[in-house]
């Protein structure tokens, strides 16, 4: 099946499965093409491509799998190609005529519209206007169809009007994200939940429904790459979906510091204060970077009090507990803990696999269970590294024209990471790490004590040694003070059972795996 045959049918399928507004805004205006044998969907700009990949790529690829399974997955990129008409009835393909955006060899085809639209530059919104304001203003300037006489048959909206409405909606959407600094990719729909983030995700959804009420401030902490930014931006995107007129802003603490310093230099302090006080939801990532900056901390203290008194929502992220931020104003440390403070944990195996499967679905690529398990076992530390590994494998899949990611493809794409991970890990390294983690002596791990606080870490160390080294059971026994191999086997089985029954031990085990391998 050619692209000219496929795309009209795909449009029909998408038209039938999507809400009318979504189809008109995002799918109907698309153009397509073929580059080097690869089918390409062109978006108006990078923002549109990001939205397509995060929200619609899975549906487009599902249709391709059904109607043109032999073709490789679509690539999404900014540009213009050929626009095809939607098939009137499924199975009846319209003639493959290039439409408004088709480009012939050497000369562009001129757009022919039923109604002439005045050409004008896109309206750039004032900083104080909301997306709803922008949309309302621009909708007033759209060309309107003549009013139909009573009882007469209504005729379809003209191409010009439909296109203009779609462009206005999309431009307003882009303006919203420019104002808020939120990524359209970070939503609750694209968030994968697991043990490490389930409670935080539930709290975030509650905040999006009722900001400024129960959990204010919402303080989220954890190591880098665990998904803090995704989760807090999802709150902003969800709030705007429910309340388009809400004033939301996401920023890194460095941006807050720079804007404050600029206000001091330019003597625009009052403007600075009013700018931040206007927001209904303010999200600041990595708040720890304001530590040691006395004037910035003082100003943020007053801003915090304003948000709290006005019941406006404040969301903050950090790499450690508020109480452990060295150099932070004690008053701020205290206020950070007034609301809800939660930690994000490294993703467990099941969550890592689910993340890979979700990424594959969004990219329109199939991934075999064995390959997902392999990648999830290889990358244990954080979500960011896991997504980076998937992007490499996904790129290899497209370049090699292999629509299914299997374990061989994953191994080939990640061979340098595999080589790094396979550095020599010895029983001594594991014993030392476990002793430090549980705050016991190495001599206790190797000794004869059988108290629970010693025996359990010893069994964990044995199990880790079995997983991370090539030592046999007798050799592991020798490394642990000359123990019998049956003792080692018993310890490994005990830990395997406890990892299923005891969430705390399972979490300890995962943390130790990450510490030892990194």
Curated annotation (Swiss-Prot):
One of its GO terms (biological process) is regulation of DNA replication. Residues 145-172 are annotated as: Disordered. It is found in: Cytoplasm. Keywords: ATP-binding, Cytoplasm, DNA replication, DNA-binding, Lipid-binding, Nucleotide-binding. Residues 1-72 are annotated as: Domain I, interacts with DnaA modulators. One of its GO terms (molecular function) is ATP hydrolysis activity. Residues 72-180 are annotated as: Domain II. InterPro entries: AAA+_ATPase, Chromosome_initiator_DnaA, Chromosome_initiator_DnaA-like, Chromosome_initiator_DnaA_CS, DnaA_C, DnaA_dom, DnaA_N_dom, DnaA_N_sf. GO terms for cellular component: cytoplasm; plasma membrane. Gene3D superfamilies: 1.10.1750.10, 1.10.8.60, 3.30.300.180, P-loop containing nucleotide triphosphate hydrolases. Pfam families: Bac_DnaA (PF00308), Bac_DnaA_C (PF08299), DnaA_N (PF11638). ATP binds at residues 225, 227-229. Residues 398-518 are annotated as: Domain IV, binds dsDNA. Coiled coil: none annotated. Residues 181-397 are annotated as: Domain III, AAA+ region. Belongs to the DnaA family. Domain I is involved in oligomerization and binding regulators, domain II is flexibile and of varying length in different bacteria, domain III forms the AAA+ region, while domain IV binds dsDNA. NCBIfam families: DnaA. Oligomerizes as a right-handed, spiral filament on DNA at oriC. Plays an essential role in the initiation and regulation of chromosomal replication. ATP-DnaA binds to the origin of replication (oriC) to initiate formation of the DNA replication initiation complex once per cell cycle. Binds the DnaA box (a 9 base pair repeat at the origin) and separates the double-stranded (ds)DNA. Forms a right-handed helical filament on oriC DNA; dsDNA binds to the exterior of the filament while single-stranded (ss)DNA is stabiized in the filament's interior. This is Chromosomal replication initiator protein DnaA. The lineage of its organism: Bacteria, Pseudomonadati, Pseudomonadota, Betaproteobacteria, Neisseriales.
């Amino acid at each position: 099946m050619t692209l000219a045959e496929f795309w009209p049918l795909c449009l029909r399928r998408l038209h039938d499965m999507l809400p009318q507004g979504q189809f008109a805004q995002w799918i109907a205006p698309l153009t397509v093409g073929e580059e080097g044998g690869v089918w390409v969907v062109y978006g108006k700009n990078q923002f549109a491509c990001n939205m397509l990949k995060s929200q619609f790529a899975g549906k487009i690829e599902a249709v391709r799998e059904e109607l043109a399974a032999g073709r490789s997955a679509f690539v999404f990129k900014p540009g213009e190609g050929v626009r095809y008409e939607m098939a009137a009835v499924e199975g009846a393909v319209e003639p493959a005529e290039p439409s408004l955006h088709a480009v012939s060899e050497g000369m562009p085809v001129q757009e022919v519209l039923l109604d002439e639209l005045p050409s004008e530059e896109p309206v750039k919104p004032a900083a104080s206007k909301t997306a709803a304001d922008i949309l309302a203003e621009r909708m007033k300037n759209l060309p309107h169809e003549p009013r139909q006489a009573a009882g007469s048959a209504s005729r379809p909206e003209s191409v010009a009007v439909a296109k203009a409405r779609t462009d206005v909606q999309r431009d307003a959407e882009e303006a919203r994200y420019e104002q808020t600094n939120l990524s359209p990719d970070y939503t609750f729909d694209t968030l994968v939940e697991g043990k490490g983030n389930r409670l935080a995700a539930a709290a975030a959804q509650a905040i999006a429904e009722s900001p400024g009420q129960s959990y204010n401030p919402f303080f989220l902490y954890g190591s880098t790459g665990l998904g803090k930014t995704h989760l807090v931006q999802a709150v902003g995107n969800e709030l705007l979906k429910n309340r388009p007129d809400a004033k939301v802003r996401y920023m890194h603490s460095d941006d807050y510091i720079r804007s404050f310093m600029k206000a001091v230099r330019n003597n625009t302090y009052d403007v600075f204060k009013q700018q931040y006080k206007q927001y209904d939801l303010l999200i600041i990532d990595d708040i720890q970077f304001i530590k040691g900056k006395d004037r910035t901390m003082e100003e943020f203290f007053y801003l915090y009090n304003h948000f709290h008194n006005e019941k406006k929502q404040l969301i903050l992220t950090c790499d450690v507990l508020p109480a452990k931020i060295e150099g932070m104003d004690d008053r701020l440390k205290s206020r950070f803990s007034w609301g809800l403070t939660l930690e994000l944990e490294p993703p467990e195996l099941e969550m890592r696999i689910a993340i890979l499967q979700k990424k594959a679905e969004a990219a329109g690529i199939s991934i075999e269970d064995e390959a997902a398990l392999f990648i999830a076992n290889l990358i244990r530390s954080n979500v960011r590294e896991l997504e980076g590994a998937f992007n490499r494998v996904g790129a290899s899949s497209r370049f090699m024209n292999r629509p299914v990611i299997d374990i061989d493809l994953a191994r080939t794409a990640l061979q340098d990471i595999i080589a790094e991970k396979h550095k020599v890990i010895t029983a001594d390294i594991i014993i030392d790490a476990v002793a430090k983690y549980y705050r016991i002596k190495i001599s206790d791990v190797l000794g004869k004590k059988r108290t629970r606080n010693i025996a359990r870490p010893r069994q964990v160390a044995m199990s880790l040694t079995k997983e991370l080294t090539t030592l046999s059971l007798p050799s592991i026994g020798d490394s642990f003070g000359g123990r019998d191999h049956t003792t080692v086997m018993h310890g490994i089985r005990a830990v395997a059972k406890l990892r299923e029954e005891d969430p705390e031990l399972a979490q300890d085990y995962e943390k130790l795996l990450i510490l030892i391998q990194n």
